[in-house]
Amino acid sequence: MCPRHPEPVPLAHPLPVLKEALEKVDQILRQAMSAPGVAAMSAVVIHNDTVLWTGNFGKKNGSDPASGAPNEYTMYRISSISKIFPVLMLYRLWEEGIVASLDDPLERYASTFTINNPLGLASAEQQGLILRRMASQLSGLPRRLRSTSLLWKGSTQEALNLLKDDVLVVDPGTRCHYSTLAFSLLAHVLAAHTAQGDYQRWVSENVLEPLGMADTGFDLTPDVRARLAAGFYGSGRPAPLYDLGWYRPSGQMYSTAADLAKLAVALLGGGPRRLLRPDAAKTLLAPLLACPGAYFANETGTPWEFHAQRGYRVVRKDGDLDGYAATFSLVPPLRLGLVLLLAGPRPPGPDLVARAYDELLPALERALREAEPGPAPPPTAHPFAGYFTFANLTFYEVRAGPAGELRLRQFGPRVEALVPPAFRTLALRHLHGRVFQLHVAHEFPCALPLGDAWLSLEAQHGQLVNFYPLDHHGLSPGFDVPGLNTYRVLRLRGKPVFKT
């Protein structure tokens, strides 16, 4: 059925259908607290710029029987969710012109960078390792620098020196391969081209402070440690708080459910502050390449993993680090977001976030379809009402509906023989002036059989109808539907009569 995605119209909360879905999400997460090592959990669901629900479970410190429950301001390590921030830096520098193109080679910003690519064609080597691929899982770089752990304390120049004798494990842009190295290298290289000259300072001044994310950062100070939910391994043993050194951009950060909700709202285009222009934000949230079945996601993007679920692309960034697990996820067509933070390992079995979306997606879709407003009427229907024809092949009647809205009815012997009555009449939603928008229905078949062909209702839905300037009688002499390549649909003096 179409439209495949409902319009993300404002909703008047609370709605029973959403309340029921959120209660089921609460139950799913509450039951997951019985998994080994999971001590605390905080979650938040966002729609548009509104927090629909928060859930907090367990104890902030699972080792202390007297510990209180966490809340949306409890800090957790967010591990690979940190990778979102180097990508935001890349896109902002691109908007500001410091980065000329997302497809610039890394060498343009790190002149001493070189690495062997034994799997690539000679003609492709010159543009293989581009910034866009560095910001996704398409760089082909190894997971980490040779002979280093996540605790390595070296410099970016030392990293570049190590890469000279290393090899790409995948030809860039050809296959999804997870690399922590790529995001840390991207962050440190780009930071050298900013006024701050320091990655962490740039993130604080350009992302965290503007969004009011005061409880998000990098340094595990005594105050931060006191507010962190205590992390545990699956065995129940407390996990240490490692400092990731040079790899900090890829996994060092801590945050709260409340702060990550602010980031989700900004990326969905809501709230008072936007991080990126709409065109850049759309590029940021688009997939780059489908991943093979063995990979853990359907598609990769910058820096996202995309998972297909119930007809939607769920945009996700998951992170797992000793004692902690986290997921930041968005469904842009619905302007829906879900953040999940755990002190403890990710529970085994069916994915918690996917189970939550199994409840949220159909509920929100239903709520949006039911809340969709009727077609807006024009100030007066008179200039547009009447009979029209396209080359004496198809015939239309435009008339006012009960609420003053315009309706476009297609008629004639052939139409009446082939098209069901319910789909011969489309609403015309008034936009401004003489421009209207075709609206089939809240829900309809995407296509109908039409003799030996098919009539695409999906193609008609949402198309603009541009009526001509009014004549001296105050009537529009016709209209065009440019999106359907239909021009010169002209007014008739009266209702046509068809010979049988």
Curated annotation (Swiss-Prot):
Family: Belongs to the beta-lactamase family.
Designated name of the protein: Putative beta-lactamase-like 1
InterPro entries registered for this protein in UniProt: Beta-lactam-related (IPR001466), Beta-lactam/transpept-like (IPR012338), Beta-lactamase-like_AB/R (IPR051478)
A Pfam family of this chain: Beta-lactamase
Coiled coil regions, renumbered to chain: none
Gene3D superfamilies for this protein: DD-peptidase/beta-lactamase superfamily (3.40.710.10)
